[in-house]
């Protein structure tokens, strides 16, 4: 037996009436939001006795187009409690919420009791409709925006239809089967996607498989309190990441062709290799995320004593402009943030633990090899291999300029506090820098902290390929054997 559910997110119920224009029209909306005032008004108002708008409350009047017909129709909606016959949808997996609230720009969720209308098609093809109360996430008064339909999806199969037809999408306890991407590429302009419960994935041994993909314009991606997105990393971790071993999804959460949008307040754990790939975005802000890959620190039967997770970058950013990453916590085993191309990028308020620090690069050998205007600021790098790093690939070309590290605190760094090297290869540095990638206008301000081992400073530039480095208030201690072939004055 197939069944679906239609959740009406406002009370009292508005059923079986001539709702002005559409279910999301502001006239019906203001009646439902201000039900007490509307009920008092409707008790004395009918279209047959009132033909003018004199004395009508302004809030009702303005939202009903100053028309008595709409006022009367909305009053009828408010007082009607009859439940209509509802055709059985073909999908069994979605819960649709009809709401006059709009696409949110900020989210505060609460749990309230709404009415759920369950539709079940019996063997005789007759349609049975029952109404029962159920707790569902609904928006508080701060849930504001441009209106539209909100859909709650509880099964993977319903995601595509929700993306195509809904302004606001709540993904609740989604399980994505093997080889099944949570595909959010067709979102409506201004849409919001909210993760709730635990999102999980089946095993997909394929390096080209992307578990989550999102794109869109003026889109918001967020999560309710207590949600978890679990990447099933333990099924893949073998200590080799993308460098070898078994096939595994290379990028867990792909964000591409996304404009004037926000990703905020997500909790992600146990991703297989790289977590976020940010590609070809403009005016995107990522804020308040927690990326927790701490389970990958431990060795397993495949990793030969090394951490099981490898190449587990938090954020790989490329070909993007006016991008902001802020107030985010990352525990991983590779770059906390790596910018490989792009312009006007701000990374602020980061807490990076266990990985390879705040990085530019590696640069060279890609379709876009220019980085211009990147600021890392007000961040901590803890128990990591590197603090602040710029790495360019040996024998390649490109340009890196206008880079700023400011107010960065380092603690328990094992390899390099500040590292600029032009001999990088994924398999290990060559020790022989090349000058095909130029690095210019790099400023380190108030970069301070301690090493557990390694070098406080390591700068290895090619011939005449580095210029205009500034060190101001830089103090890193605890390491030894510092080496800087640029500037001519040596290490800070």
Curated annotation (Swiss-Prot):
Placement of PbH1 repeats on the sequence = 216-238, 258-280, 281-319, 320-341, 371-392, 400-422, 434-478
Q: Which InterPro entries match?
A: Glyco_hydro_28, Glycosyl_hydrlase_28, PbH1, Pectin_lyas_fold, Pectin_lyase_fold/virulence
Q: Which GO terms describe its cellular component?
A: extracellular region
**Which PROSITE patterns does this entry report, sorted A to Z?**
POLYGALACTURONASE
Documented EC number(s): 3.2.1.15
What this chain does, per the record? Involved in maceration and soft-rotting of plant tissue. Hydrolyzes the 1,4-alpha glycosidic bonds of de-esterified pectate in the smooth region of the plant cell wall.
> What's this protein's family per the entry?
Belongs to the glycosyl hydrolase 28 family.
Active site at: 334, 356
Annotated compartments:
Secreted
Give the species: Aspergillus oryzae (strain ATCC 42149 / RIB 40)
Designated name of the protein:
Probable endopolygalacturonase D
GO aspect biological process, one term: cell wall organization
Glycosylation is annotated at 292, 407, 441
Paired cysteines (S-S): 151-166, 336-352, 461-466, 484-491
Signal peptide positions (record) = 1-16
Q: What molecular function does GO assign, one term?
A: polygalacturonase activity
State if Hydrolase is listed as a keyword. Answer: yes
Q: What is its main location?
A: secreted
Q: What keywords were assigned to this record? A: Cell wall biogenesis/degradation, Disulfide bond, Glycoprotein, Glycosidase, Hydrolase, Repeat, Secreted, Signal
Gene3D superfamilies, per the entry? Single-stranded right-handed beta-helix, Pectin lyase-like (2.160.20.10)
Catalyzed chemical reaction(s): (1,4-alpha-D-galacturonosyl)n+m + H2O = (1,4-alpha-D-galacturonosyl)n + (1,4-alpha-D-galacturonosyl)m
């Amino acid at each position: 037996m197939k069944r679906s559910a239609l959740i009406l997110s406002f009370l009292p119920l508005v059923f079986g009436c001539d709702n002005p224009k559409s279910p999301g029209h502001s006239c019906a909306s203001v009646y439902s939001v201000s039900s007490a005032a509307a009920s008092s008004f409707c008790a004395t108002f009918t279209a047959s006795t009132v033909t003018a708008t004199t004395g009508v409350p302004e809030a009702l009047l303005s939202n009903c187009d100053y028309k008595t017909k709409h006022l009367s129709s909305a009053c009828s909606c408010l007082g009607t409690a009859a439940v209509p016959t509802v055709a059985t949808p073909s999908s069994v997996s979605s819960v649709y919420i009809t709401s006059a609230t709009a696409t949110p720009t900020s989210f505060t969720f609460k749990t309230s009791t709404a009415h759920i209308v369950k539709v079940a098609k019996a063997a005789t093809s007759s349609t049975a409709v029952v109404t029962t109360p159920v707790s569902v996430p609904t928006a508080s008064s701060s849930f504001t925006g441009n209106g539209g339909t909100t859909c709650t999806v509880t099964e993977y199969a319903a995601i595509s239809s929700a993306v195509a037809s809904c302004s606001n999408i709540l993904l609740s306890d989604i399980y994505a089967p093997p080889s099944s991407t949570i595909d959010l590429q067709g979102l409506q302009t201004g849409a919001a996607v909210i993760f709730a419960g635990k999102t999980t994935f089946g095993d997909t041994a394929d390096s080209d498989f992307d578990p989550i993909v999102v794109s869109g314009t003026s889109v918001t991606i967020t999560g309710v309190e207590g949600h978890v997105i679990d990447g099933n990393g333990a099924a893949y971790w073998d200590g080799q990441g993308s460098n070898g071993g078994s096939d595994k999804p290379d990028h867990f959460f792909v964000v591409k062709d996304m404009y004037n949008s926000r990703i905020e307040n997500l909790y992600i754990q146990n991703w297989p290799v790289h977590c976020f790939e940010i590609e070809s975005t403009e005016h995107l802000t990522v804020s308040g995320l927690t990326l927790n890959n701490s389970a990958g620190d431990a060795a397993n039967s495949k990793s030969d004593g090394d951490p099981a997770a490898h190449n587990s970058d938090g954020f790989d950013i490329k070909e993007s402009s006016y991008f902001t990453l802020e107030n985010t916590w990352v525990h991983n085993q590779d770059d906390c943030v790596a910018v490989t191309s792009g312009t006007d990028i701000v990374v602020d308020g980061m807490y990076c633990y266990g990985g390879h620090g705040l990085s530019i690069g590696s640069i060279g050998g890609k379709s876009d090899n220019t980085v211009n205007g990147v600021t890392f600021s007000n961040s901590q790098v803890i128990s990591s291999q590197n603090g602040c790093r710029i790495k360019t690939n040996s024998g390649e070309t490109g340009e890196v300029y206008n880079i700023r590290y400011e107010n960065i605190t380092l603690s328990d760094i094992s390899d390099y506090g500040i590292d600029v090297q032009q001999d990088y290869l994924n398999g290990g540095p060559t020790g022989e820098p090349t000058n095909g990638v130029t690095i210019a206008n790099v400023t380190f301000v108030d970069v301070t902290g301690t090493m557990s081992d390694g070098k406080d400073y390591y700068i290895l530039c090619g011939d005449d390929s580095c210029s205009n480095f500034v060190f101001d208030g830089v103090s890193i201690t605890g390491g030894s054997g510092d080496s800087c072939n640029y500037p001519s004055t040596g290490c800070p």
